[in-house]
């Protein structure tokens, strides 16, 4: 009678004896890591399948810092701001953690940003507004009085949201913020494919690669 199979158990670097005990008690046929660390030799020698976590878009800050133009981005829309007399200043980062995001004013903002008159529903011409980098604000020079306006802009993700969540919830101290890179970008795409091939060659004991953020 076969009493082994169809059970995968998680492990961690500080739970090796418990993992070995549960592997035997439950008849598990696979072990997966929880934190992406290397498997200790004791677990490699069990004969169980090894499921290894692989981070496709982070945990390589050296690359991320060397290629800041290929950091992941997202679009953010500001709240509605009402114009009165004179110019209207719309701050972009209100309510947004500067540890998490940074305004992308590197790319062509006239092409990629959008300022909308929400009262009329019309997008403003790029000549009707400008960006003040010192205050991280968009200034509409001659808005219609009492009309509401929003700005949609690109922001770099300078701290991976999953890593940020884990750091805050687990109260991690003195942990470097992991910067997510965009694997769709040309330099990072080529680097990521090379990095994955090198990982597979250097981890022959891994049966299944678990892609994660």
Language-model-detected regions and their locations in the chain:
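Glycan-processing catalytic domains of CAZymes
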Residues: 1-213
């Amino acid at each position: 009678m076969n009493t082994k199979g169809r059970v995968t158990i998680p492990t961690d670097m500080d739970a090796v004896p418990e993992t070995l005990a549960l592997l035997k008690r439950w008849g598990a046929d696979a072990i997966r890591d929880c934190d992406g660390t290397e498997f200790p030799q004791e677990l490699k020698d069990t004969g169980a399948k090894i499921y290894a976590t692989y981070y496709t878009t982070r945990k390589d800050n050296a690359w991320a810092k060397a290629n800041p133009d290929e950091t992941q981005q997202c679009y953010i829309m500001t709240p509605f701001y009402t114009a009165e007399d004179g110019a209207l200043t719309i701050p972009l980062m209100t309510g947004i953690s500067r540890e998490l995001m940074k305004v992308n004013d590197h790319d062509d903002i006239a092409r990629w940003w959008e300022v909308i008159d929400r009262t009329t529903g019309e997008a403003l011409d790029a000549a009707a507004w400008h960006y003040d980098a010192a205050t991280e604000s968009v200034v509409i020079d001659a808005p219609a009085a009492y009309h509401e306006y929003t700005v949609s802009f690109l922001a770099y993700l300078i701290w991976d949201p999953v890593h940020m969540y884990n750091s805050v919830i687990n109260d991690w101290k003195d942990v470097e913020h992991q910067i997510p890179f965009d694997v769709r970008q040309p330099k990072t795409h080529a680097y990521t494919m090379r990095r994955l091939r090198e990982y597979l060659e250097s981890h022959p004991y891994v049966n299944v690669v678990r892609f994660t953020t």
